[in-house]
Amino acid sequence: MKRGGKESPILLEKFFGSPPWGIIFFVSFFPAPMKVFRFGRNIRKGLIFMPPMYLALLIFAITYGTMIALPNYRAHTALLAAALMVLFGFVPLGQVFHEINWNVIMTIAGTMGLVTLFIDSMMPARLADRIIDKMPDVKWVTVAISLFAGLISAFVDNVSTVLMVAPIAIVVAKKLDFSPVKMVIAISIASNLQGAATLVGDTTSIMLAGHANLNFMDFFFFQGKPGLFWIIQVAMLASTLFLYFYMKKDDKRVEARNLTKVNDYFPSWMLLGMVFSLVLASFAEVPEIIFLPNTAKNTTGYICMIFMVLTFLIETRKKGFQDTLHIVLSDLDVFTLLLLSGLFIVIAGIRNAGVIDQVAKLFTKVGGKSPFLMYTLLVWASVFFSAFIDNIPYVATMLPVVAGIAGNMGIDPTVLYFGLLSGATLGGNLTPIGASANITGIGMLRKGGYEVSNRRFMSMSIPYTLIAVLVGYLLIWHFFGIRG
């Protein structure tokens, strides 16, 4: 598609789809139609056979089931469910704006926008070319490019990582006349693995940071101990060792190829600047700024948005406003932003109805008084569920549940939070449908004429994932486990 002109996306449909569900959602919260909200509360009161908590749970269950059955309509479903939570009085109208975690929304939007310009600069392709040129054979190319994809994914969205690295693998495979299937699968599962390594690595990491008030450096060192970043690196090395032996027979020689030309270095410098600023903000006490509401609470989001806007403004001088806007909007995942906005309100509804407290009590009852048993249950249950359902709604739901469990048990929730994140992030690697990055990678292979069976995918993904989860499971408990 050409940039600019008549072929540019219609902004209304880009942001809200067709029909414009986002507009319908926000207009539904406009104070004028108060009779509608009174009507909704009257309906709830009329359902005398169903206590409020059960009604909220029913809305949540239908929402979750619909999101699983209709994955392309997850955002629409979440927004409609959010409207129902308000309509039935579970979330007061005046609290809707405050229930949305704007730090998470701004962090995702800012990072996505900047990363899109970074990808468009061709810098990732250039870096991948350099790695490939140094490798002796296909086996080492696969290992190296999976490690490279993992490194990129620690700071860039998983799907974006696959979109920027997988085409390089496919080109190399065609040039050397071998199947790129193993290489692209390795890129996809390595990208998912590293998503939990840093605050900006994945939506679930951003959500955890927003919920638990973690800063960028807390993922590197927390409570004076090695953080998730280092734990994930050890898990990555262990899984890569398996990958090396799995690929051992792929010893075809690799020839040098021409390096991709970088067309713009500015987005790369701005991405580095954003990461450096996030590191600095982790150590500094951020003051409140008048024109930035809740500055201290939303520091991460403001930093990401400021760097994205500055990069956008500079790029408009080089490419023109319309072309730059097209680049950013073409890959800005408005779907996820609307999905999260709706989920924040839905979760507030079930929290206010008392559902989360009851679920936390149920987990506490099953896990007893043993923190280790509870941690084990959370990790492996998260691995299982995330293999079949999207981890974003799962983590969004479980974060307040984990907080409730820790409160009931009277323990520090850190080990449970980290266990939830690692299990939910890594569990998506088990199946081809468990993570968006997997679906993206398989789609790219299919488009290139390569079919991938579930058996072939899982012959790589299951051992790779279980090794990573087991290493992470043991190390998280070793550093943060509660003993005695």
Feature roles, as predicted:
Residues 24, 28, 42-118, 224-361, ...:
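Hydrophobic transmembrane alpha-helices of multi-pass small-molecule transporters
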Residues 94-181, 339-409, 413:
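Membrane-embedded alpha-helical segments and adjacent helix-loop junctions characteristic
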Residues 139-144, 174-186, 216-226, 409-418, ...:
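Membrane-interface alpha-helices at helix entry/exit sites of multi-pass transporters
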Residues 147-150, 168, 185-195, 223-229, ...:
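Transmembrane helix-bundle signature of multi-pass membrane transporters/permeases
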Residues 153-163, 180-218, 236-240, 383-399, ...:
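Alpha-helical transmembrane segments and, especially, the helix-loop junctions at the ends
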Residues 169-175, 210-213, 402-408, 440-452:
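Helix-loop-helix connectors at the membrane interface of multi-pass transporters/channels
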